[in-house]
Amino acid sequence: MEPAFHAALSRGLAALALPVAPEALPRLERFADRLLAWNRKVNLTTITDPAEVAEKHLVDSLLLLPLLDEVRTLLDLGSGAGLPGVPLACARPALEVTCCDSVAKKVAFVKAVAAELDLPVRAFAVRAEGDPEGEKLPRADAVVSRALSDPERWVPLGVRYLAPGGTLFAMLGREADEARLAAIGAASGLALVDVSRFELPLSRSARAIARWRAR
């Protein structure tokens, strides 16, 4: 991978104080390399500049890392090319990650890269519609989606996949109204824990992550 990738990844991790161990960096680089290689044959991402991949896929995914606390299992719904699930597994190999997406070629990529990197990641080609048993998807300590960024759609769906005492995350690409997020969570029996705000250092793009738990 070219120097711009390494510079963007290092700068993002340092600027945001993300707890990524040095031994995780080769896994993250390999994931990015395989993502771009597969993308030449199948459409996995519109972001192809290596520095942008580092910031907008890897660093953006890893914003969740300090918020996972004692989470042991994570379900990534609508994961696409495994984002954020695979980068999180790269950084925290003890985390058991399940990715699901309705697009078979994206699921095939996630399975292949997880096997190549020896990560505890499972992937299923299924559309999540709120029936974990029927869809054969596990309930998890943490449930997240980058694909569904509208909390009014995401929260009522995601809550159905939470294990008892679990945490639901919404990854938002814009400023978030905490009163609105609290009300959305309350309608699904969840209490808003907090909203963490970030700025990606290269693009200056705003990010917010909302976190809810059962009342």
Curated annotation (Swiss-Prot):
GO terms for cellular component: cytosol. It catalyses: guanosine(527) in 16S rRNA + S-adenosyl-L-methionine = N(7)-methylguanosine(527) in 16S rRNA + S-adenosyl-L-homocysteine. InterPro entries: rRNA_ssu_MeTfrase_G, SAM-dependent_MTases_sf. It is found in: Cytoplasm. S-adenosyl-L-methionine binds at residues 78, 83, 128-129, 146. Keywords: Cytoplasm, Methyltransferase, rRNA processing, S-adenosyl-L-methionine, Transferase. One of its GO terms (molecular function) is rRNA (guanine-N7-)-methyltransferase activity. Its EC number is 2.1.1.170. Pfam families: GidB. Specifically methylates the N7 position of guanine in position 527 of 16S rRNA. Belongs to the methyltransferase superfamily. RNA methyltransferase RsmG family. HAMAP family: 16SrRNA_methyltr_G. This is Ribosomal RNA small subunit methyltransferase G. The gene is rsmG.
